[in-house]
């Protein structure tokens, strides 16, 4: 999927609410859900469990615009929360938020890390630290990216990649509260530190030997 793509979800308005009604829907293979939005009344809906679960497993359901077809009427929304049964993993409830396609929105976009095994610092024995696996951005609904890439290839020990280092499209802005947070870093491990310490005396001895040889030759 690319910018501007939508995920279609068919739904129907449900007249009844409450625990008993929700239980009956689930028994019939449906998911109780709600769509809410600013200056709009919430709409209680139901949707196919099998269809929605498949979309959850194969599509970026949280970071892509949803085209809700409610009894044939199209509405655009974002998936805000998915509740699942703690044992079976079945989806028990979904919250959607209405979206105005003419206004910018905030959305959490997943980060995809490239070259983790080829990372310069990791190859030298450093430990890779991933501090953020998603990024809160502000953009138009039609410009939501499926994901954002972070290349770790040249990341050395003791160095970090900040949000400001990412090549973000001009159509979006970072909306995180923390100013320029670290996305990933490589820290020295105990083995790396020990290797440095083991090498230090040898270098010192070599330097002392060279100095003594130079003094003898005078």
UniProtKB/Swiss-Prot annotation:
A GO term, aspect molecular function: structural constituent of ribosome
Family affiliation: Belongs to the bacterial ribosomal protein bL25 family. CTC subfamily.
Keyword Nucleus assigned: no
Function (record text): This is one of the proteins that binds to the 5S RNA in the ribosome where it forms part of the central protuberance.
Gene3D superfamilies linked: Ribosomal protein L25, beta domain, Ribosomal Protein L25, Chain P
Gene that encodes the chain: rplY
Gene Ontology cellular-component annotations: cytosolic large ribosomal subunit
Biological source species: Anaplasma marginale (strain Florida)
Protein name: Large ribosomal subunit protein bL25
Signal peptide: none
Keywords associated with the record: Ribonucleoprotein, Ribosomal protein, RNA-binding, rRNA-binding
Protein's GO biological process: translation
UniProt biased composition (Low complexity): 202-218
Subunit text: Part of the 50S ribosomal subunit; part of the 5S rRNA/L5/L18/L25 subcomplex. Contacts the 5S rRNA. Binds to the 5S rRNA independently of L5 and L18.
Annotated region (Disordered), positions in chain: 187-218
């Amino acid at each position: 999927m690319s910018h501007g793509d939508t995920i279609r979800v068919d739904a129907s308005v449900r007249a009844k609410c409450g625990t008993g009604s929700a239980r009956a829907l689930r028994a019939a293979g449906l998911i109780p859900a709600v769509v809410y939005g600013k200056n709009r009344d919430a709409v209680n809906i139901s949707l196919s469990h099998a269809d929605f679960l498949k979309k959850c497993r194969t599509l970026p359901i949280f970071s892509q615009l949803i085209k809700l077809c409610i009894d044939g009427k199209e509405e655009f929304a974002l998936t805000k929360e998915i509740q699942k049964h703690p044992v079976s993993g079945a989806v028990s409830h979904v919250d959607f938020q209405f979206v105005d396609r003419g206004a910018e929105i905030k959305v959490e976009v997943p980060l995809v890390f490239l070259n983790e095994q080829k990372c310069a610092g990791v190859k030298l024995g450093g430990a890779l630290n991933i501090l953020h696996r998603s990024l809160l951005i502000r953009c138009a609904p039609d410009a939501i990216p499926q994901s954002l890439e972070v290349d770790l290839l040249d990341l050395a020990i003791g160095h970090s990649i900040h949000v400001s280092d990412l090549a973000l499209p001009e159509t979006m802005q970072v909306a995180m509260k923390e100013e320029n947070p670290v996305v990933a870093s490589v820290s020295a491990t105990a083995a790396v530190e020990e290797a440095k310490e083991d090498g230090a005396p040898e270098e010192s001895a070599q330097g002392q030997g060279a100095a003594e040889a130079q003094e003898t030759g005078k």
